[in-house]
């Protein structure tokens, strides 16, 4: 956040971060959502970057027995020592597996309140109704599973049901699982998803796991899951867990449908997705993500059809600019934003305002920013006079 605020955005607004192991992205997503829902902010840029591919990190996870080592993979596939193997199949969520593969990732999203998104004509890729967080309570081992993730998944499912209805949850939803590729995860997470599906009357709950392709980027991993979900709605394909040929025997599956092959899906047939993240130490988080067509339906109900007509008109230019930028970036022809020592604000940029009684009531930073109100209301006002 420091680098982005100081050298990319020149941001003077609220900033902050949460660190929650592998659930870090969702913890920060929740922080941005709460700031917008409370009216504290109208826009929030949320994201994480993780670059753990260093000898020290590899050694630490290897000591834990969490990584898919070459020797383990050869043993898993009944190969002789030194034999070559397909390293692209190293991470096998919910299959016969032996650990995860570390990855680098940087994922950022822009959240806006309803009115601002419509006013700007922003590309609406989906929406997040909430992120639910629960710890595990007392634990036998800090790395062991607990009850917390059952609670977060159940809450996320309940939130989806309250918005899109019981039938849509049962027939038109999907789960982006944490799916690390470890034996412990395949047992614990499948049990959680299977139990919640049973309690909510869901049969054949579709389960995807993007780590099969990109590995485990730790703090950014839920960002990978979110991007995969948004891509599902943009391109109409559910990514299959194609590193797995068959599920492991200890995977719970009575109420689940693990998507092992790419599955073409009409973008309008999945209304909601649940993202699940299980962070080391009991940092459990699950998010409810609504499809673009559901988001637009909600916006039309709240703001009226005229507002939506105006939005689609504004969006034409935005969508064209977005496509042009994407094409340029894909060609390697992108413009780097880096404002080092550019537009630095000091005391001379501050202008304080006062009421007619001389009470300091506002401060403005620079000429192009609106004044900041200093006449703050507090529930404790006057109690200490």
For each predicted feature, which ranges?
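Active-site-proximal alpha-helical scaffold in enzymes
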Residues: 5, 15-50, 100-122, 216-241, ...
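Conserved small-residue
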Residues: 25, 32, 61, 110, ...
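Condensing-enzyme catalytic core mediating Claisen C-C bond formation in acyl metabolism
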Residues: 72-174, 291-358
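Beta-strand segments within the central parallel beta-sheet cores of soluble alpha/beta enzyme folds
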Residues: 15-20, 41-49, 123-132, 166-177, ...
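Active-site-adjacent elements of ketosynthase-type condensing enzymes
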Residues: 26, 52-90, 134-155, 180-192, ...
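Conserved beta-ketoacyl condensing-enzyme motif
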Residues: 1-15, 35, 49-60, 162-187, ...
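A glycine- and small-residue-enriched flexible loop/hinge segment at structural boundaries
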Residues: 1-14, 344-385
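Conserved catalytic cysteine-centered active-site region
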Residues: 1-31, 64-67, 71-101, 192-224
């Amino acid at each position: 956040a420091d680098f982005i605020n100081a050298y990319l955005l020149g941001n003077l607004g609220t900033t902050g971060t949460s660190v929650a192991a592998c659930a870090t992205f969702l913890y920060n997503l929740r922080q941005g959502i709460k700031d917008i829902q409370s009216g504290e902010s109208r826009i929030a840029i949320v994201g994480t970057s993780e670059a753990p591919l260093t000898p020290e990190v590899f050694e630490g996870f290897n000591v834990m027995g969490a990584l898919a080592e070459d020797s383990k993979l050869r043993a898993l596939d009944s190969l002789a020592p030194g034999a070559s193997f397909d390293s692209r199949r190293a991470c096998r969520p919910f299959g016969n597996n032996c650990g995860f593969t570390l990855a680098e990732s940087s994922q950022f999203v822009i959240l806006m309140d309803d009115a601002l998104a419509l006013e700007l004509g922003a590309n609406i890729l989906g929406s997040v109704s909430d992120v639910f967080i629960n710890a595990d309570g007392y634990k036998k081992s800090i790395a062991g599973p607990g009850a917390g993730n059952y609670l977060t998944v159940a809450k996320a499912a309940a939130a989806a049901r309250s918005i899109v209805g019981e039938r849509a949850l049962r027939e038109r939803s999907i789960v982006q699982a944490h799916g690390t590729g470890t034996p412990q995860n395949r047992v614990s997470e499948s049990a959680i998803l299977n139990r919640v599906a049973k309690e909510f009357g869901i049969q054949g709950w579709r389960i995807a796991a993007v780590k099969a392709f990109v590995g485990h980027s730790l703090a950014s991993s839920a960002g990978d899951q979110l991007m995969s979900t948004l891509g599902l709605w943009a391109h109409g394909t559910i990514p299959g867990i194609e590193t797995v040929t068959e599920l492991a025997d200890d995977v719970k599956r009575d109420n689940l449908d693990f998507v092992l092959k790419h599955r073409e899906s009409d973008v309008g047939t999945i209304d909601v997705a649940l993202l699940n993240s299980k962070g080391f130490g009991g940092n459990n988080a699950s998010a409810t993500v609504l499809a673009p067509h559901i988001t637009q339906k909600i916006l039309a109900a709240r703001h009226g059809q005229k507002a939506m007509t105006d939005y689609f008109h504004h969006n034409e230019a935005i969508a064209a600019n977005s496509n042009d930028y994407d094409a340029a970036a894909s060609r390697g022809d992108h413009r780097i934003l880096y404002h080092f020592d550019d537009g630095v604000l000091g005391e001379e940029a501050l202008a304080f305002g006062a009421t007619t009684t001389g009470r300091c009531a506002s401060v403005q930073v620079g000429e192009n920013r609106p004044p900041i109100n200093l006449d703050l209301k507090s529930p404790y006002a006057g109690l200490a006079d």
